[in-house]
């Protein structure tokens, strides 16, 4: 499982956090894989901690504030609901990438070793359908039309799935080892971080074709987009930095130093939050100055950052 541990981060823009906080501020949720913990960050500090099962990886949320987390080694999904203890759903496969329907009825789970995506009931875990994809499906993103985009890491492609019929409707070639995905706010573009080729593939979601490839730093791993869609933020594991790309010109306009081995990233209003795997903390970036303004300690091995914002798709 060492290869999974080294690529186990997703940067997700998701629905509201639990606890009734407004979407204009925190909370920000941080998943620590080695520490098996979900931390809630509010007002620049850790305001709560939820113990999880071993090695949680990916996270998603629905409009009701329920959080979902995958455990590849445990073949399971943990469900965290406001006011209730976490519950566990068994998954018939190596659960890795994850997306949730906005109403929380369905979960879409990438089976890392099975080259497929499962649609399961979020209430019972019952399998409702499957779709074949490429090798080692990583990040999953669901759009407002019900199309699911899947980064097929070892197939150098993104699979596009109709979630109503659970059929693959398109395959889009990318760079080497696509891992993290992010949709533009208007969903006209999908940004794909390619780990081994050091670049970003930009996919036109209307034509389902790649329209550009952009250098994105040393080992780009996580990707997020600012709320106005003007900037794309990409973590660079081997540079301890975040590369900032102008979305209109598709040019690098800034580089922000963060902690060692940055992985997941999420944007919340005027700030971005970056999970630093090697230093067990989260960097806070001011989007006006493009500078790191704080580091927040969390449990060992932070991989995923889940932030409030647009509803989960």
Task: List the predicted regions and their residue ranges.
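N-terminal secretory signal peptides that target proteins for export/translocation
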Residues: 1-2
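Predominantly soluble domains enriched in secretory-pathway, periplasmic, or organellar proteins
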Residues: 5-313
């Amino acid at each position: 499982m060492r290869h999974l541990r080294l690529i186990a981060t997703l940067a997700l823009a998701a629905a509201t956090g639990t606890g009734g906080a407004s979407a204009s501020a925190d909370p920000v949720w941080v998943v620590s894989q080695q520490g098996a913990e979900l931390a809630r960050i509010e007002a620049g500090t850790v305001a709560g901690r939820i113990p999880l099962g071993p090695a949680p990886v990916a996270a998603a949320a629905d409009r009701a504030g329920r959080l979902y987390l995958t455990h590849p080694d445990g073949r399971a999904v943990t469900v965290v609901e406001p006011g209730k203890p976490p519950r566990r759903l068994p998954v018939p496969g190596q659960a890795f990438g994850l997306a949730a329907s906005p109403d929380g009825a369905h979960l879409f789970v990438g089976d890392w070793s099975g080259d497929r995506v499962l649609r399961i009931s979020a209430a019972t875990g019952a399998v409702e359908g499957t779709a074949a994809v490429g090798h080692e499906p990583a990040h999953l993103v669901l759009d407002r039309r019900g199309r699911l985009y899947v980064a097929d890491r070892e197939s150098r492609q993104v699979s596009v799935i109709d979630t109503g019929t659970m059929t693959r409707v398109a395959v889009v070639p990318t760079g080497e080892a696509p891992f993290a995905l992010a949709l533009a706010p208007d969903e006209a573009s999908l940004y794909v971080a390619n780990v081994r080729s050091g670049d970003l593939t930009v996919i036109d979601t209307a034509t389902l074709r790649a329209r550009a490839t952009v250098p994105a730093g040393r080992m780009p791993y996580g990707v997020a987009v600012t709320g106005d869609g003007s900037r794309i933020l990409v973590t660079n594991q081997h540079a301890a930095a975040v590369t900032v790309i102008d979305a209109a010109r598709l040019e690098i306009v800034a580089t922000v130093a963060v902690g060692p081995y940055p992985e997941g990233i999420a944007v919340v209003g005027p700030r971005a939050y970056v999970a630093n795997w090697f230093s067990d903390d989260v960097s806070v970036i001011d989007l006006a100055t493009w500078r790191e303004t704080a580091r927040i300690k969390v449990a060992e091995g932070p991989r995923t950052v889940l932030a409030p914002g647009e509803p989960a798709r």
